[in-house]
Amino acid sequence: SHVYGPQKGLGAKDIPLAEAALRRLAMVWSKQNSSASKLPGSGAAGGLGFGLHCFAGAKIESGFELFSGMAKLPQLIRRHDLVITGEGTLDRQTVMGKGVGELAKMAKNCDCDCYALAGKIENEKMLSPYFNECAALVDLTPSRKAEANAAIWLERSAGNLAKQCAI
């Protein structure tokens, strides 16, 4: 609730209520069955992983690992000089299992540079071990203007990022 709740529209006063409700559900379920709430990924997608595991018998696994394995992503990355990726917001959640953060880590492990485009960036210093450079649309124009004309501002931001790559 504390990590993803605000991103999904949960107000500050509602976070403790949601957290308490989810903890209660996890406690009730663990008394009946297992400690699924402790499984990595059980809190992802608003607790969808937990619910599907408990009530439908689904196996929780990393979506990034699944798809990167299917696409043979490490082999593809090793054949290139750089990776360019993007996300609406780059922040501390980016490196907590989100696909774009996992891609950046994989690129670094493959000795490949990784660049990112985003709508906005929070705490760029924390992201610097994973990305060679990041560019945000809101650095060029106010957030509302960027949202209203995202394609234009994304193109300009990508152009600026390309100049950084060429240096």
Show where each model-derived region lies.
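N-terminal loops that bind phosphate or other acidic moieties
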Residues: S1-I167
